[in-house]
A protein has these predicted regions:
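Accessory carbohydrate-binding/adhesion or oligomerization-edge regions at the termini
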Residues: 1-59, 135, 141-144, 216, ...
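Accessory beta-strand-rich segments of carbohydrate-active enzymes
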Residues: 6-11, 16, 25-31, 63-180, ...
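Active-site-adjacent substrate/metal-binding segments within catalytic domains
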Residues: 55-79, 83-91, 95-103, 108-111, ...
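Short, aromatic- and glycine-rich surface loops/edge beta-strands on solvent-exposed regions
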Residues: 131-134, 248-260
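Surface beta-strand/loop "capping" patches
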Residues: 175-205, 461, 564-573
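Substrate-binding/catalytic cleft of secreted carbohydrate-active enzymes
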Residues: 198, 316-319, 328-552, 556-559, ...
Length: 573
C-alpha cells in the first residue's frame, strides 16, 4: 500500500504537524443523503480506506470504478486544545464539493476539485477524542464542475481516464498561535536585488513580522514590519544576488517570525530570483533567450490514479524527462501537488500551470463564477514558484456537440483576471484553440507525415501555420507548438495514439528525432511540448510505460535526448 509521509506544503513549513494520511473509515453515499441519515453524528462507517488515495484507485483498498456522486470519511483524533492556540485541519485536494464536520458540527465547506483548503476546527474540538467526518460530492458529468481528464462515461476511452472522487491528496493537522501567517506572495526584483513580500496574517491585535533571507546558510538580508491588519508588505534588499535559472537553480531560504501577545509563529520558506520577459518572438529568463523543450505530463500514477504512491515519484518523473533532454513540462489538465513544484524549483525544471477545464461548459453564459474562484486559488497557491513560467487556464475549447462555439467573453475575462493577479508571467488563454487574447500563440500539431511537417515549418518565414484558420488570428505573438508527436509505440493493438504507428524502432526513432529537428530549426518557434512522457491507461503514446518502465534501450534514449537537446535557432542572439 502507498504511503505519503513528507510535509505537503514545502513553501510554508512549520516544525509541528500531524500527518493524517493512512487508514480512515469510509462509505459510499450514492443517494447524497449522508446528512439526512445522520452520518456526521454516527459513531462509525463500514469500510476502510487508505487516504489520500481516491476510492477508485487500487491503493485506496476500495477500487470502485463506477460513478459515485458522493462518499463519506471518518477518523478519530486525539486533540488537546490550548488557550491562545488554533488547530488547523488541512486538505491538499478533494473532488469536488467537500464539507467537514467535527463532533457533528460543520466547520466549513470548499467548492472545487483541485486546490487546497484549510478549516480552523478549534471551536468545535474537545479535549480527548474527536470525531472528524468528511463528505465529498462530485460528478464529472456536471458541466459546472471542471473535471479534467476524468471520463464522463462508465469506462476510460481515448484520452479520457479513470475518475477520481473524494480525497486524493494529503490531509494533515497543525497547531498555530492565535496570530499566525496564512500565506505570502513573493515577487523577485533581480534588477534591484530585492525580494518584495506581501504577507497574509490571521488573528486580532498588533503583529510584528520579521523576514530574513539566507543563501547557503548565510544571512543576506532582512526586513521587519508591524500592523494591526491582516496583511503586511515588506522588501528585503539582498547583499548577495544569485539568480535562479534552469542551468543553476539557486534557491534562497526565507525565515519568517510573526510575534504577538499569543506567541510566535515561525515558518520556513524559500524563493528564487529570476525574471521572465517576452521579447519579440522569444521568451527570456534573466535576459537569456530560452527554447522550451517541454514534455506533456498528465499527473496520473497507475495504482494511485491522481495520487503518487510516494513523495519520491515527483522527482523521479522530472528526472525521467530530463534524461530525455526536456527542460520542462506542461502540467496538463489538473493542478499538480505542491511537492512536484518544489522538486521542479530545486531541479530548474520549467513548468506551465494549467487547470482541469475539460468537462466544464465553456460555451454557456454565466459560467465565470463556476470557474474563476478555483482558478485564482490555484494561481495564489503557486505564484511563488520560480520554476513556473506561465499560466494556461483552458485547453482546446472545442465547439459543443450541438455546434455552439466557445464563449469568447469567458476566455477574455479569465485572461484579464490572470494578468491582473500575476503580471509577471505570460498567459495562454486557451491552449491550441481557439485563441481570443493571448501572450503566446500556441498550436497543437499531431501531423505524423515528416514531409508535410517540413513543408509546413520550412515556409514559416513567409506564412505562419495556423491550425484553425478562420477561428483565431495570429497577431505576431511568440509562437509555440505546445502539443506534437504523440507517436504510438505499443504491443497492444487497442492502445490509442496519433496517426499510424511506426512499424519498426528505427522508423519510430527517425520520426521522433526529425520532428524535434524541424521545430528547433525554425527561428520563430519559442518552444515545443512533446506528447507525452508516459502512457496513461489506454493512451499509449508515451516514451515510458504507465508504470514508468522505459520502452526503449539506453542507446535509443540517448539518440532521442541528443535530438531534443540540439541547439535551437531561437536561442541564438
Amino acid at each position: 500500500m502507498g504511503e505519503r509521509k513528507l510535509y505537503p506544503r514545502p513553501e510554508l513549513v512549520r516544525e509541528s504537524w500531524q500527518n493524517l494520511c493512512g487508514e480512515w473509515e469510509f462509505d459510499f453515499d450514492f443517494g447524497k443523503s449522508a446528512r439526512e441519515r445522520g452520518v456526521p453524528e454516527a459513531a462509525h462507517l463500514e469500510k476502510k480506506i487508505n487516504v489520500p488515495f481516491c476510492p477508485e484507485s487500487e491503493l485506496s483498498g476500495i477500487g470502485h470504478r463506477d460513478f459515485m456522486n458522493a462518499c463519506v470519511y471518518k477518523k478519530k483524533l486525539m486533540l488537546s486544545p490550548e488557550r491562545g492556540r488554533r488547530i488547523l485541519l488541512n486538505f491538499e485536494a478533494a473532488y469536488y464539493r467537500t464539507e467537514v464536520f467535527v463532533n457533528g458540527r460543520s466547520v466549513g465547506m470548499h467548492v472545487g476539485g483541485y486546490t487546497p483548503f484549510s478549516f480552523d476546527i478549534t471551536d468545535a474540538a474537545l479535549a480527548g477524542e474527536n470525531d472528524i467526518t468528511v463528505i465529498c460530492e462530485g460528478d464529472p458529468r456536471d458541466r459546472t464542475q471542471p473535471s479534467g481528464k476524468q471520463s464522463g462515461k462508465y469506462a476510460s476511452y481515448g484520452c479520457m481516464y479513470t475518475r477520481c472522487t473524494g480525497i486524493y491528496a494529503p490531509v494533515w493537522l497543525e497547531e498555530v498561535p492565535d496570530v499566525y501567517l496564512r500565506g505570502m506572495r513573493l515577487t523577485p526584483d533581480i534588477d534591484g536585488a530585492r525580494l518584495n513580500i506581501h504577507a497574509f496574517l490571521s488573528g486580532k491585535g498588533e503583529k510584528h513580522v520579521k523576514f530574513e533571507a539566507f543563501l547557503c546558510g548565510r544571512s543576506v538580508g532582512a526586513a521587519e514590519a508591524s500592523t494591526v491588519g491582516d496583511n503586511i508588505a515588506a522588501s528585503i534588499g539582498l547583499s548577495e544576488l544569485s539568480l535562479w535559472s534552469p542551468e543553476k537553480p539557486t534557491l534562497y531560504d526565507l525565515a519568517v517570525t510573526v510575534s504577538s501577545e499569543s506567541g510566535c509563529d515561525r515558518v520556513k520558506s524559500y524563493f528564487g530570483m529570476r525574471k521572465i520577459e517576452m521579447d519579440g518572438a522569444c521568451l527570456r529568463i534573466n535576459g537569456k533567450r530560452i527554447y522550451q523543450r517541454l514534455v506533456l505530463d498528465q499527473g496520473y500514477y497507475g495504482a494511485g490514479i491522481y495520487t503518487a504512491e510516494d513523495d519520491g515519484d515527483f522527482l523521479r518523473d522530472i528526472e525521467r524527462a530530463r534524461r530525455l533532454g526536456f527542460n520542462g513540462a506542461r502540467l496538463h489538465q489538473r493542478v499538480f501537488e505542491r511537492r512536484f513544484l518544489y522538486e521542479a524549483d530545486k531541479a530548474g525544471f520549467l513548468v506551465w500551470g494549467e487547470y482541469a477545464n475539460w468537462g466544464f461548459d465553456h460555451t454557456a453564459e454565466g459560467m465565470l463564477g463556476y470557474f474563476l474562484p478555483e482558478w485564482t486559488e490555484a494561481m495564489e497557491r503557486d505564484y511563488n514558484h520560480p520554476a513556473l513560467i506561465g499560466w494556461c487556464p483552458f485547453n482546446e475549447t472545442w465547439d459543443a456537440h450541438d455546434g455552439r462555439h466557445q464563449n469568447d467573453a469567458l476566455l477574455r475575462d479569465v485572461y484579464t483576471a490572470t494578468k491582473h493577479l500575476d503580471p509577471t508571467r505570460p498567459c495562454i488563454d486557451t491552449s491550441g484553440n481557439y485563441h481570443v487574447v493571448t501572450d503566446i500563440y500556441d498550436i497543437h500539431d499531431y501531423q505524423q507525415d515528416i514531409a508535410a511537417l517540413h513543408r509546413r515549418y520550412d515556409s514559416f518565414e513567409k506564412e505562419v501555420f495556423e491550425n484553425r484558420p478562420g477561428r483565431q488570428q495570429y497577431r505576431g505573438e511568440p509562437y509555440m507548438i505546445s502539443e506534437y508527436g504523440g507517436i504510438r509505440w505499443t504491443n497492444d493493438e487497442s492502445g490509442w495514439g496519433y496517426g499510424d504507428a511506426p512499424k519498426t524502432l528505427e522508423e519510430y526513432l527517425e520520426r521522433y528525432c526529425t520532428m524535434a529537428e524541424i521545430m528547433a530549426a525554425n527561428p520563430r518557434i519559442c518552444g515545443v511540448c512533446y506528447t507525452q512522457l508516459y502512457d496513461v491507461e489506454q493512451e499509449q503514446n508515451g516514451i515510458y510505460n504507465y508504470d514508468r518502465t522505459p520502452k526503449f534501450d539506453e542507446a535509443t534514449m540517448n539518440r532521442m535526448a541528443e535530438a531534443m537537446r540540439a541547439p535551437a535557432a531561437i536561442e541564438k542572439e
